Amino acid sequence: MTTMTVHTMGVHYKWQIPEVLRQQLWLAHNLREDLVSLQLAYDDDLKAIWSSYPDVAQAEDTMAAAEADAVALSERVKQARIEARSKKISTELTQQLRDAKKRLKDARQARRDAIAVVKDDAAERRKARSDQLAADQKALYGQYCRDGDLYWASFNTVLDHHKTAVKRIAAQRASGKPATLRHHRFDGSGTIAVQLQRQAGAPPRTPMVLADEAGKYRNVLHIPGWTDPDVWEQMTRSQCRQSGRVTVRMRCGSTDGQPQWIDLPVQVHRWLPADADITGAELVVTRVAGIYRAKLCVTARIGDTEPVTSGPTVALHLGWRSTEEGTAVATWRSDAPLDIPFGLRTVMRVDAAGTSGIIVVPATIERRLTRTENIASSRSLALDALRDKVVGWLSDNDAPTYRDAPLEAATVKQWKSPQRFASLAHAWKDNGTEISDILWAWFSLDRKQWAQQENGRRKALGHRDDLYRQIAAVISDQAGHVLVDDTSVAELSARAMERTELPTEVQQKIDRRRDHAAPGGLRASVVAAMTRDGVPVTIVAAADFTRTHSRCGHVNPADDRYLSNPVRCDGCGAMYDQDRSFVTLMLRAATAPSNP
């Protein structure tokens, strides 16, 4: 058995994107847009097939009417709350909205039932349309690769990402959530890929093979400087930095039919094991403010880790609560003491016994993210003021041409994106008008604020995610079994929004703190670390444990009282912390002897 792993290498921040790479990103973007167009046309044709059946068409008419009623009532409720400056409004109006949503839900189910009746009859027509979609997608390969310059591995990567997005959207629709594919403009970001082909029985594509300048894959991917991981662990940090600075050579499509390569100055932080079988690599280019960043992701197959069979059982329950030190995102408990590193004890809190505690996202991260939001707010206000100035100037003067056409004040009044005004500032920079100086002064300041905003946000989120990875590493190094609850943060958030009576500003502040803490990210890091290190992971249903008192076993009612902490148990009358009770029950269920 083997496991897939991805090693990421950062590309030097001063590296300039070559024109051949920019062209490949542009082709990959156009391919993705064509795939979206084909999929949207397929969805429309599939809907037309269902609508051709009278019963389904009638159900769709009913659903459309119910949806229109629900939207209209939602707007009335929204307006009533604005006028009342409170969540508490007419009970009759809110009941009408609930009834409208219930009718819409029933109408959607009626359509699904009508489709189920004619599903077999429409099978041939659906299959024919699916075959046509597959043929259209296949034809794009000839357009972009055989007759164009896009590298075939990049084509496969874009197509795989597209199919993954289609499956995700189908799953969201099946759960009743609105979702659809959208077109995007090209901003210079994207992904290109290479794949290392190997015939059955051929030697593995090991790091040593890729480090060989005369190796089999030298014209696809060459990663020099490989160091055995055991030797790497014995090197100092300075030695690792120096040894890890290598230049990767990677295939990058073609220009007029001629193969092209690019050189990537990367920093390696860890090396793959000697027996790893490297299957390919992706160069991911992202845009941070107005600057491009790149990273190289190398994918490989490695042998499975030996499963862990000894160690304490650790239970982890997600949530979010405000504390003096930050936002508590989880409660944990172990059946044996855990050794928490000194540097993490302010984040992974532990009691005197060393068997339980909470995980807290430091308040400094919240303050840093709040600062970036304040910068974004300042930029938005400055943009509004600039828009008014440009509109006023255009109303009183004859405007210079913009993109070979006169620019109207009514057009600029509709602009919302800062990029539009930045483009206008560049276009009118040297025309000698008063408005050009105003535009350029705004652009010069906004560019700096945008960089501060995005870099500050990126660093704060990176700090949070790194803390989560460190916590996951601490648990995986010591635990023999990990229990994680299946609490859905999104569902809890939506439920809280529906029932809250707090002012909108207060609720938005709570939502921002929850989003900044991202409890789900901690669970993802823990599960990934356990899977990598061979530690068994069990997902525990949170449905009953959240309301059960661990001391007396009483299951309390599911009402709003139990959103606060602590609460009083209706069974024994004692006050208790429901989060600590939850992890206690998780451990008790895991260690209880199974019935024969």
Swiss-Prot record:
Coiled coil region boundaries: 55-83, 91-117
Positions of Zn(2+) binding: 549, 552, 569, 572
Chain intervals for the UniProt region annotation (Recognition domain (REC1-N)): 19-53
Region span, RuvC-II: 578-596
Biotechnology: Has been repurposed to perform C-to-T base editing by fusion with a cytidine deaminase and a uracil glycolase inhibitor. The small size of this protein may facilitate its delivery by adeno-associated viruses.
Co-factor binding details: Binds only 1 Mg(2+) as opposed to 2 usually seen in other Cas12 enzymes; lack of the second Mg(2+) results in loss of target DNA cleavage activity. Binds 1 Zn(2+) within the target nucleic-acid binding (TNB) domain.
Keywords: Antiviral defense, Coiled coil, DNA-binding, Metal-binding, RNA-binding, Transcription, Transcription regulation, Zinc
Molecular functions per Gene Ontology: DNA binding; metal ion binding; RNA binding
Annotated region (Target nucleic-acid binding (TNB)), positions in chain: 541-577
GO BP annotation list: defense response to virus
Sequence segments annotated as region (Wedge domain (WED)): 191-302
Cysteines paired by S-S bonds: none
Keyword rRNA-binding tagged: no
Lipid metabolism in keyword set: no
Positions of the UniProt region annotated as Recognition domain (REC1-C): 122-190
Phenotypic consequence of residue 152 to A: Loss of target DNA-binding in vitro
Linker, as annotated region: 303-313
Tree of life domain: Bacteria
Segments for region (RuvC-I): 314-541
Region ranges (Recognition domain (REC2)): 54-121
Positions annotated to bind Mg(2+): 317, 579
Effect noted on mutating residue 485 to A: Loss of plasmid silencing in vivo, no change in pre-crRNA processing in vitro, decreased target DNA-binding in vitro, in vivo no change in silencing when crRNA targets a reporter gene promoter, strong disruption of silencing when cRNA targets downstream of reporter genes
Task performed by this protein: CRISPR (clustered regularly interspaced short palindromic repeat), is an adaptive immune system that provides protection against mobile genetic elements (viruses, transposable elements and conjugative plasmids). CRISPR clusters contain sequences complementary to antecedent mobile elements and target invading nucleic acids. CRISPR clusters are transcribed and processed into CRISPR RNA (crRNA).
UniProt family annotation: Belongs to the CRISPR-associated DNA-binding protein Cas12m family.
Annotated domain remarks: Has a bilobed structure, with a recognition (REC) lobe and nuclease (NUC) lobe. The REC lobe (residues 1-302) is formed by the discontinuous recognition (REC) and wedge (WED) domains, while the NUC lobe (residues 313-596) is formed by the discontinuous RuvC and target nucleic-acid binding (TNB) domains. The crRNA-single-strand target DNA duplex is bound in the central channel between the 2 lobes while the non-target single stranded DNA is bound to pockets in the REC and RuvC domains.
Protein name stated in the entry: CRISPR-associated DNA-binding protein Cas12m
Upper classification of the organism: Bacteria, Bacillati, Actinomycetota, Actinomycetes, Mycobacteriales
